Amino acid sequence: FHPMKGPMTTQTLKGMANSGAMHWRGDRSNGFFGVHADDAVLSFKNFAPAFEGLLGNPEPMSEGGMQAFADFMLQVQLQPNPIRNLDNSLTAAQKRGFDFYFGERPSDGILVPEIGNLRNFVKSHNCNGCHTVDAAQGLYGTGKMQSFEGISQIVKVPHLRNMYAKVGRFGGAAVPFATAPDTGHQGDQVRGFGFVHDGTVDLLAHFFTVRVFQPTLNSGFPLINPNQTRRDVSDFMHAMDSDLAPVVGQQVTLSADAGQRLAAWPRIDLLIQRAKTPFVSKLLGGQVTECDLVAHTVENGLRRGFWFDAVANAFVGSDGSRRTDAALRSLANVAGQEVTYTCTPPGSGRRIAAVQ
């Protein structure tokens, strides 16, 4: 309850490596160890005084201590989006939201250019103009810039990768700057806070009724059926892209049981397909595939591990031996030789496949 900030929701500590300045206001870009608007490591280290002022330490954390903490914390990433389809496709509603988000219709905003750089003046934006999605730059909703929203302070444009985690605060009162109706009491709640910096909004579709998004002839949500587009954009934002593809972490075991094989077979096909599919992630080094597929089994009493070589279309054992897809699946025909397939983060397949 800072006298200037007021109450604000706690932001996730995951996935911060490429998002620039931290805090809702981006204010940690200027602090204890220096000033830089785009340096996530420095911004993280500038939290050092909080260990004294908020947590009761006798003094701020040392720079060495904060550097070690930053080295660890900035490697922690957001999990794959649990709403996005496992083949990374969009539903019809999500695709409509995607098309509006990246479309030509301005939704809100005037870009204030740097002094002396008027060539970059843009009078209006689509959603992506402020909430930039660019996997090659590691941006998933934040362009690292600040915005003036007509509230008591200037805030940084936040990322949008964890909107699904904010669902659960149901209902809200009507407010003067939006057209969403007063919902009345909605019963038991899952979360105490919802969307935006202070957690006061229950649904993204309700947030999209604020004045800056109001439908006009050439800006805001469409004049015809705006609520449908609001819901579509909400659906897309709940399925937002991230550094890890949706298939990462998926696992299936193939056994000799006929019914189980019938269910597992198409899932294995999917995992192999996604392990071949190109994917872009700055965090993972740029151009990769959606996952590294590994398989583990017990063959003739010995534990075996394999990683999928997408170029050769074969499974490579930790001992260097190779198996075709069909040959590996056939091992599971024998009870006790079940084969477990796992889509692991790109770059980790060989390590995870290795049997110690």
Residue ranges of each PLM-predicted region?
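Periplasmic c-type cytochrome electron-transfer domains
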Residues: 1-356
